[in-house]
Swiss-Prot record:
The gene is folD. NADP(+) binds at G166, A167, S168, I232. Signal peptide: none annotated. PROSITE patterns: THF_DHG_CYH_1, THF_DHG_CYH_2. Keywords: Amino-acid biosynthesis, Histidine biosynthesis, Hydrolase, Methionine biosynthesis, Multifunctional enzyme, NADP, One-carbon metabolism, Oxidoreductase, Purine biosynthesis. The keyword Oxidoreductase applies. One of its GO terms (cellular component) is cytosol. CDD domains: NAD_bind_m-THF_DH_Cyclohyd. The keyword NADP applies. This is Bifunctional protein FolD. Homodimer. It catalyses: (6R)-5,10-methylene-5,6,7,8-tetrahydrofolate + NADP(+) = (6R)-5,10-methenyltetrahydrofolate + NADPH; (6R)-5,10-methenyltetrahydrofolate + H2O = (6R)-10-formyltetrahydrofolate + H(+). GO terms for molecular function: methenyltetrahydrofolate cyclohydrolase activity; methylenetetrahydrofolate dehydrogenase (NADP+) activity. It comes from Salmonella enteritidis PT4 (strain P125109). One of its GO terms (biological process) is tetrahydrofolate interconversion.
């Protein structure tokens, strides 16, 4: 069996085009364009690349994009004060603080300072709690982007045995909640899991997010499984690979996401969707 490739770049482009059309309709009706504030502290090269892609996507769909590039020496108090200012700004619908933050700044305190109705990353306890209670509003971007991929490929998830490898707050934990909403019987594995291979071999839907190249051998993949690889790892030779041994897995799976070009583009596309949603549902309801 040769797996069908789940093309995240194409689906992400479709999502952005749909958002752009809605923004154009808003502006044509005399309503304001959604606004996104992107905050970067320090000069982490990977963070700079991620932030640039988010700002580019904002421009592409017609959002108002505000950039705040703060020095590495920025204090926690200064960052919190900026967030307070953005929370009170009626032209800003979403606030994104790029992680990781420099040492000395408490990630949790910063993320919890963002108003829940402007938390377009979906990390605030309010938004995670709503997802857990089956009443989601602004949803964590990567898990929601994965669900969008499955939906766009008309993959029926109801009744599937889903296994999530990795239990991070950003992907693994909210992903498990999304999969429950999608009708899956869901298992989350982590560093204390015994016999990881057993869990992988029984997964109809496998989602891997650990950040270790080639962590899951292809021979573990169940015949016909759907494989979603969230990992983005740069090898010493410069090649970008995922957490799953792609060629081996693709020979056994029915669907698989490539790295790059699979999940990554969907994270940014979902951020854009969330910003439009925040604008319409929370801040500018006449634009519905």
């Amino acid at each position: 069996m040769a797996a069908k490739i789940i093309d995240g770049k194409t689906i992400a482009q479709q999502v952005r085009s749909e958002v752009a059309q809605k923004v154009q309709a808003r502006v044509a009706a005399g309503l304001r364009a959604p606004g996104l504030a992107v905050v970067l502290v320090g000069s982490n090269p990977a963070s700079q690349i991620y932030v640039a892609s988010k700002r580019k996507a904002c421009d592409e769909v017609g959002f108002v994009s505000r950039s705040y590039d703060l020095p590495e020496t920025t204090s926690e108090a200064e960052l919190l004060a900026l967030i307070d200012t953005l929370n009170a700004d009626n032209t800003i619908d979403g606030i994104l603080v790029q992680l990781p933050l420099p040492a000395g700044i408490d990630n949790v305190k910063v993320l919890e300072r963002i108003a829940p109705d402007k938390d377009v990353d979906g990390f605030h306890p309010y938004n995670v709690g709503r997802l857990c209670q089956r009443a989601p509003r602004l949803r964590p971007c990567t898990p929601r982007g994965i669900v969008t991929l499955l939906e766009r490929y008309n993959i029926d998830t109801y009744g599937l045995n889903a296994v999530v490898i990795g239990a991070s707050n950003i992907v693994g934990r909210p992903m498990s909640m999304e999969l429950l909403l999608a009708g899956c019987t869901t298992t989350v594995t982590h560093r204390f899991t015994k016999d990881l291979r057993h869990h992988v071999e029984h997964a109809d839907l496998l989602i891997v997010a650990v950040g270790k190249p080639g962590f899951i051998p292809g021979e573990w993949i169940k015949e016909g499984a759907i494989v979603i690889d969230v990992g983005i790892n740069r090898l010493e030779n410069g090649k970008i690979v995922g957490d799953v041994v792609f060629d081996e897995a693709a020979a056994r799976a029915s669907y698989i996401t490539p790295v790059p070009g699979g999940v990554g583009p969907m994270t940014v596309a979902t951020l854009i969707e969330n910003t439009l949603q925040a604008c319409i549902e929370y801040h500018d309801p006449q634009g519905k």
